[in-house]
């Protein structure tokens, strides 16, 4: 008896131990081997007795008893009859739980096709038989016969015959002269008759022979599926079912409701239809019914089985009584409500509660306040056991009573139980791992959970009604993990960027800012203090103010560890702040001897963490929080109407702008400017005005005012809030006290009448109406953004979930080059910030002395980065996840520092998931809109380059000409001007536009702010490179050129018009040529004629016969029209990059280096070819639509990777032409740019991890003598494995090129079918996997969660390792014992074995 009670917790069947899971197609024999009996009747349960009907869908004889250890008729009850089969009702006496495990089956009277293999595209049956889906369906649904064996007749093999044709053929050739069949039997015979080996050989031969690309692809597809069937051991005829399995009844329950009705699973309905139709078919066949009736019944049976497996995939959806589609077996797995995502990947858990959160400012960082009522409920089992141990109760029932009465001893025990037992707090949505953290509970009265203010940033929580959930880690291991890994004190740094995330905000910042203000002319200025006591005395006696400038004697510890005293200029407030600083020689008083804004405070916390360690940081954070709150309260900073200062000059600026707008309106009415130009100019003028007013307002608000009583007055409180970073921003202040500015229409365009009022003055009705558009759109955007961002995160997690740190070093020599990112002259991301925490790939040497500064494989710490920046090194090669050579996972050296800990990354760290969370979490902060760049509204196009540093100019790729006016002009597109400082270190680099006017030349010295170059942002010039006389070609008035008079200036403009649309203009090729003295077209120095092709809308700047010198402008192409393009920004751009989509107007990139040649035009496309420099390569040709402007001329030299036509490059092209490193650099920069605009910091390595996952496939270009098929995409690992095998066998190896897959595609093509099936397109993934007989090695996180094991990351990885070692040891011991047993047959007592040491 006792044994059985213990057994309740252990399943009857021992849990299977397995390392991998294989999925394949079930054969009829297999289905029968699972089954415990055939289901012959559609009945379920008897409506009166509620007992299952015999042979029905719930039959107890087949599936097992309904009550534990009790047969159906009640003859055998209790445990003692276990295993007996009752002779009356034939039910086995056992646990009722077997009804969840035992399956049944239905023998079909006619075979039916499995809909997944038929309809899931591409149709597997169709591919194997090489028949179209339409033909297959015609045969299956009894419309056409198919000839199986033509015999000696004129019919062809597999020919389709309609009813009439079949009868005619029978009359013509006689009944037995040929074999034709119809329905699933026919298909089954066809599949049975396939000889796979022969078919494979034929296909391979055909592939070698074929020239056509399309045919090759088709054959490759067939070959793959034939191979799949051969190697997986599946037989093709198993795709046609003769037996249908029936799942256990407890997985499709039927529950009686009160009132005599039943709630049932849809599957029972679907099974019932199958059984009904099957039985009817059997009966009809026995009765020898007419063919047509039987055929109809067979078709209905096929439809019933289709609906059971996948309702709605073919034909109408079968609906239940309430017009709702029935949920079929496939629907049980699919989608968010399916088995995978609803029950396997996320479950509801025990021991949890949720409540509203309130602020707990008196808590320590590692604590949270837990309401007593909640704690009592959550820790019940612990309390019961402790009551029992103390002898206060003997039974659970008694303990329950005590707890329910809430006796005083229960509270004492609760205190004991809760001591040092951490709980997990979680706030939904959990966007990154900091959304769940562990705290030690502190019991509190009330019903709300108290949360420490500093962790709010990590949870993204505020106290306006947010709720949080509490979970209790039960086992000792769980408690240990919670304490060591998840405690809030261990999560000081943000995993996305390594910056502190436990940073004061709002009130605390304001208090610290107030504390650290220094004001001139206050009482007691210049007094000297020796210690804190004197200072406090003086403050209380009002001799000095918090903000008074004083001198103070500061004691601190020097570098040598001895105390040092020094006198510093500071304020009383800053000294108070200095008291909470940890004593360390690395942290000086200067760290806080300044105005403390949020940024400064964050910097100090970072410094403390780096130099003093975690414990000190936590204590410091708690102290500075208390100080901040106290001083915010003492300061009493409030917010009054008069704090919003409207600048005096506001109306002056508004009036000036109004008159400008009026002028533009007038110019438009006079026809001098177009509507678009007027709109752009007006919008531009108002944007400038808004900026100016905002500047004036800031000037007035931040101005230091004098106090009438002497000294400086209190600082404006709104300014304090915004400047300290506590709340608000200059943009919001502008709306409060400046002017609200321009608003957007719902379509995204800007309304040209701005809102002149601010909130202090109040808006007029019209202004208010105009402002509602934008506000409403903002709210709608926010709602959409959340969903989109969540979906992006889900795709990212899915693609990267199996990226885990598995080894220390993969030993690769590869890496990627890093340099600072410079955007229009300003350094956006310094080299130091990009290489911090990464591993050097090669020795880093000083440029001047060639001395090794940093050895290869060194993890770069802050000190190394300082060394590099001091040495002025511009480029560093570092190791990266992209170049890591490990097969499974990434190595620690290639990954670098674990950003959340600041130490080298640990084994088993799930870096893929962290990367996905780091990129996905800020997704909600990104914008959703597509920017329309319309003219000047956002046209702060840079048209001037000024130097940001003093230095010396160097020019790379130099090509400068002095034009007719004596100006220097840039003649090439890839010219770069660099400014170097006195040591020769490059401080800034600028890309110079083609045709820009240069103000400096090589070797010139420039001062900061001096102009380097300028150009016209509204047009692109075409320049001449030789001196000569102008001639026109094909520039025919009225056909390819038209003259218009510019009314504002009265000058005639000649514009190239679309010559293809004019009469007789189709063959024209308009160009300007430059002729020499002999009247012949001159040659260019780089080869080719001096002929400049013109595109539509070019404006000519010269006349026939004019003399030109190099650098003169021949024509301009106005870019005003090109400026209204859409720029995809924000989230859609990030998604577009990760999905590796081809942009709409993709750039065309030169695939080889060479010379441009213009070929014959083709219809309305231009033909451009590149003559290669390297004679071994073949020339490349590109067809470009004629309207597109090509900025290259005949004879231009292009490098590999140059743009021939501007635009966004397609990432695939970058990969194909420039390789992996360039692609990675492009993706990282583009994605970072989107996040940078929103001020979000993400470390590059996260994006690199995701890009690594996108590059896992190889396309086979030449199959060599391997089993691969050229043109197929194959896993890199598999590709290498097959090549190694071929090499060992002395065969020719295959070659391949890396393929870039978007994240969705990459997730669906992972090695694990479990992971792919639970992501998207479940049906397709499972069908594919079953046909291939795929094995899931259970390597990723997702698969292991699904099968219910520890994940192979973090502590789960260590557990797996320990288990491995244990198994090895056991084996050694057992072998040793066997040996000893063999040597000594009857030794009395063997010596104890010495264990081999652990690995």
Curated annotation (Swiss-Prot):
It catalyses: RNA(n) + a ribonucleoside 5'-triphosphate = RNA(n+1) + diphosphate. Its EC number is 2.7.7.6. Belongs to the RNA polymerase beta' chain family. Zn(2+) 1 binds at residues 71, 73, 86, 89. This is DNA-directed RNA polymerase subunit beta'. The gene is rpoC. Binds 1 Mg(2+) ion per subunit. Binds 2 Zn(2+) ions per subunit. GO terms for biological process: DNA-templated transcription.
